[in-house]
Swiss-Prot record:
Cross-referenced PROSITE patterns: CHORISMATE_SYNTHASE_1, CHORISMATE_SYNTHASE_2, CHORISMATE_SYNTHASE_3
Species of provenance: Burkholderia orbicola (strain MC0-3)
Pathway(s) of this molecule: Metabolic intermediate biosynthesis; chorismate biosynthesis; chorismate from D-erythrose 4-phosphate and phosphoenolpyruvate: step 7/7
Catalytic activity as recorded in UniProt: 5-O-(1-carboxyvinyl)-3-phosphoshikimate = chorismate + phosphate
Alphabetical list of Gene3D superfamilies matching this protein: Chorismate synthase AroC
Lineage summary: Bacteria, Pseudomonadati, Pseudomonadota, Betaproteobacteria, Burkholderiales
Protein name: Chorismate synthase
Cofactor: FMNH2
Molecular functions (GO terms): chorismate synthase activity; FMN binding
């Protein structure tokens, strides 16, 4: 299997399966000299880990990270950083009924047809469990971006099923299991998820991510555009079926006189472009939204086929998130941070000494 590495200069290669002994990643290209401890990474992993509320999978994993290499006396050395997270609460017997059948909407059928073998236990390599190492690597990227450039990457849930979650304030995001920026909506979200769980069904979600403090100039046209790499990274997250940057699909109904963000000496007027023009960062906030499909593993009986092609009915009895979007905010933040640190290093390598006589205007004129 190839395609396990993200990035060009700052690379992350993940490994492991949902019910294997451990999962993890190897980070290559991290600059030396940055203070880094397991606690720096654990705080992000704890935001993503399972079993934190009744609305997510009840698989109990501590997700305790071990730094195996790349750090000496609490400082990055510039050599590969290996992160290990041991699996401790696998329950593979729950998947005995899908050894010979394929779950609708899951990767079972495609993995089998491509490789001729699949790890049916918890989805194996295709499981969202493999987003834990991404969050671990994202913690490293976030720390470097914050300390080197003052970049902050934050996200929140902006929609759950048919429920819109209007943004109110960042302070609410860390006070509820949904990463909702609106405290008033949380009771409605809880009631919705309770009813969904009783129905044995699942639902999707929308997550918004914002990176503030990104300097102008990051991005490598034509085929490594910053927004193209962001879209690829976001689409690499399990269950993501759509990505918007800036106004996204709303751009279709906007006139050029509205969508084009005017420039003034005081700064940009609007940010419909989402902080990227021509594949290069503008110095404005980078705004990204992702659409996450409903969880494929549900208790509701579904039609499928066996390996022999015969008709079958599938019910999934494992411990699954009724909405994977509930825990997706730290994952989306991490993916954006990983793309940004990679492009920061690429920009420094080629254009770090470039200066122009044009002043760098503010991201917003207001």
């Amino acid at each position: 299997m190839s395609g396990n590495t993200l990035g060009t200069l700052f690379t992350v290669t993940t490994f492991g399966e949902s019910h294997g002994p451990a999962i993890g990643c190897v980070i290559d290209g991290c600059p030396p000299g940055m203070g880094l401890t397991e606690a720096d990474i654990q705080i992000e992993l704890d935001r993503r880990k399972p079993g934190t509320s009744r609305h997510v999978t009840q698989r109990q994993e501590a997700d305790e990270v071990e730094i195996l290499s790349g750090v000496f006396e609490g400082v990055t050395t510039g050599t590969p950083i290996a992160l290990l997270i041991r699996n401790t609460d696998q329950r593979s017997k729950d998947y005995g009924n899908i050894v010979e059948t394929f779950r609708p909407g899951h990767a079972d059928y495609t993995y089998w047809q491509k490789y001729g073998i699949r790890d049916y236990r918890g989805g194996g390599r295709s499981s969202a469990r493999l987003t834990a190492p991404i969050v671990g690597a994202g913690a490293v990227a976030k720390k470097w971006l914050r300390e080197r450039f003052g970049v902050e990457v934050r996200g929140y849930m902006s929609g759950l099923g048919e429920i819109d979650v209007p943004f109110v304030d960042w302070s609410y995001v860390h006070e509820n299991p949904f990463f909702s920026p609106n405290a008033a909506v949380v009771p409605e979200l809880e009631a919705y998820m309770d009813a969904l769980r009783n129905d044995g069904d699942s639902i999707g979600a929308r997550i918004d991510v914002v990176a503030s403090g990104v300097p102008v100039g990051w991005g490598e046209p034509v085929f490594d555009r910053l927004d193209a790499d962001i879209a690829k990274a976001m689409m690499s997250i399990n269950a993501v079926k759509g990505v918007e940057i800036g106004a996204g699909f709303d751009s279709v109904a906007q006139r050029g006189s509205v969508h084009g963000d005017e420039l003034t000496p005081a700064g940009f007027v609007g940010n419909h472009a989402g902080g990227v023009l021509g594949g290069i960062s503008t110095g404005q906030d980078i705004t990204v939204s992702i659409a996450i499909k409903p969880t494929s593993s549900i208790r509701t009986p579904r039609r499928s086929i066996t390996k022999s092609g015969d008709e079958a009915t599938v019910e999934t009895f494992g411990r699954h998130d009724p909405c994977v979007g509930i825990r997706a905010t730290p994952i989306a933040e991490s993916m954006l941070a990983l793309v940004l640190i990679d492009h920061a290093l690429r920009h420094r390598a080629q254009c770090g000494d470039v200066e122009t006589s044009t002043p760098k205007i503010a991201g917003s004129a207001t």
